[in-house]
């Protein structure tokens, strides 16, 4: 009987420790943390190989420009790129950053050497100082509302922010939810 109480006591202690860890984790914000050239739009299938493969070596000039403009480095991931409106975004295996709950997730896109670049991260990890006068409050998949911000050789810089877990994705799914709700209401 005494052995049974010891096991129960040990289980309770372990469960309490796990619960405290979970509550501590709830006070954080999860954001996608990646960068990619956006030529994913020209690929037929989401799972098709990208050519040439994206990596730090063939994007050295881009990373140098980001460093010079106090924008932190993030992991290169082809799944970070925006996709066409007819393709469901897939962020499978995309790196995630855990940030303070008071932080924001951001999606930044811009043109560099004629290529569209998409960068996602926590705001505090991305920029040392927030010098963008225009942070949009949601992250749409496509937007004609472009900030006319120029940062070094980066042009048409657009930055959006949001404050819920993994909200800095391509928001096609939320658009589809709105269309579904509208369709149901019409019926």
UniProtKB/Swiss-Prot annotation:
GO cellular component: extracellular region
Cystine residue pairs: none
Region forming the signal peptide: 1-28
InterPro entries, alphabetized: QVR-like
Pfam families linked to this entry: QVR
Record's subcellular location: Secreted
Protein origin, superkingdom: Eukaryota
Glycosylation sites: 58, 70, 156, 168
An example Gene Ontology biological process: regulation of synaptic transmission, cholinergic
Swiss-Prot/TrEMBL keywords: Glycoprotein, Secreted, Signal
Stated name of the protein: Uncharacterized protein F46C5.4
Organism: Caenorhabditis elegans
